[in-house]
UniProtKB/Swiss-Prot annotation:
Species, as recorded: Rhodococcus jostii (strain RHA1)
Annotated PANTHER family: PROTEIN NRDI (PTHR37297:SF1)
Pfam families according to UniProt: Flavodoxin_NdrI
Listed GO MF terms: FMN binding
Classification via NCBIfam families: nrdI
InterPro entries: Flavoprotein-like_sf, RNR_Ib_NrdI_bac, RNR_NrdI
SUPFAM superfamilies: Flavoproteins
Function summary: Probably involved in ribonucleotide reductase function.
GO biological process, one term: protein modification process
UniProt-recorded name of the protein: Protein NrdI
Length: 158
């Protein structure tokens, strides 16, 4: 298995989820304004979804936290992403875990899973097992089955 990279805001929800996974993980710094943080190996990104909204140019980038955008704008970091997992809040309706959709589409990587807030014990088990299976089959032709964001499981039926 290869590494996890994640971002967590001051709420620490994503951080707590990653800790419960018990897998090697690296946190994207909250205050890396220059985007100089770099990874050294392929990774799966775990990211929270922010509130969203449309910019003056009509682009909707605010679902993805700015430190994650800076991190992925680094071509080295972007070249090593292999998949994304998103966290969110079902109170946001259709925007639930939307950061995962955006990153999956823009980086051309599978969207493996989504979970609410800091996840349930079942989410932790599913992600842990799913990551093992994902890394084991990354080079197989079957890896295409992972490209189904609309079918990722969610808690509370969202």
């Amino acid at each position: 298995m290869t590494s996890l990279v994640y971002f967590s805001s001051a709420s620490e929800n994503t951080h707590r989820f990653v800790q419960r996974l018990g897998l090697p993980a690296t946190r994207i710094p909250i205050h890396d304004r220059e985007g100089t943080f770099e990874v050294r190996e392929p990774y799966v990104l775990i990211v929270p979804t922010y509130g969203g909204g449309t910019t003056a140019m009509g682009r909707d980038t605010s679902y993805v936290p700015k430190p994650v955008i800076r991190f992925l704008n680094n071509t080295h970091n972007r070249s090593l992403i292999r998949a994304v997992i998103a966290a969110g809040n079902t109170n946001f309706g259709e925007s639930y875990c939307f950061a995962g959709n955006i990153i999956s589409q823009k980086c051309h990587v599978p969207y493996l899973y989504r979970f609410e807030l800091m996840g349930t014990a079942e989410d932790v088990e599913r992600v842990r097992a799913g990551l093992g299976e994902f890394w084991d089959h990354l080079d197989d032709e079957e890896h295409e089955k992972w490209r189904r964001p609309s079918q990722t499981p969610s808690t509370r039926g969202a």
